[in-house]
């Protein structure tokens, strides 16, 4: 299921001093509720996480278009729910670390190399050749370190509220539409 936010919403965002107008927020909430009903999940549910991806789209391919953000909705509690739901703690924490990295890079404009360096350092310390050679505890450590990078660069903790994450990602899409390549 997909939910589309049209270019008119972007125009409204810029006409409202780079704030998403209440009317658009209500439309987002309504579309989320409809998607929740279809999927049988609730956005922000910590035990049965409903994760979304956010990407910019255009009718034609555009160079420099922002990267997709996957696993939006994960946080320190939802990751535990995902681990329990999938019976795979490593998968859950790997998904969370990927989300933190994508969100930090694409939405918050923190240099992705900072995250890659941390992952490479941990792999080297563990004698791991590939990310897949790291276990669940290693992924938890990567998440901890990634959140520290976020804190050091943004002066605040990584956002734990899925709705806050979603709105920030939507604003990043709007910013990407206003970027000259």
What are these regions (language model features)?
Residues 2, 6-181:
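N-terminal beta-alpha lobe that positions the nucleotide/phosphoryl donor
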